[in-house]
């Protein structure tokens, strides 16, 4: 349904990383939709549903960091929850060629090199030990 009001178009939380990216493209930012997806993922109790939430590949964007980050999110959530790692996360386009440290964390490089979960580190994305933390997380 086409609507002129963007907030109406996103009344529900995204239930896939593809939906995160598609919604984010429409409003110009992905972070809030990723947080909503994580809340939805963490409250879902059925492992099959969780696996389906990670299975659908988000289209590649013009932002290689975002493409790699979404793959790291999917792989990390799959590993943490004993789910199969989606094949799409292993594509070369889902890996960075140069290390990336989020802005404002330059002074923490040494710590981030050690703490970054494997799914992020192997894509050369260096983040804290629990990059997908959400206060309401159940898993």
Q: Model segments located where?
A:
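Charged, helix-prone or intrinsically disordered regulatory segments positioned adjacent to compact structured domains
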Residues: 2-85
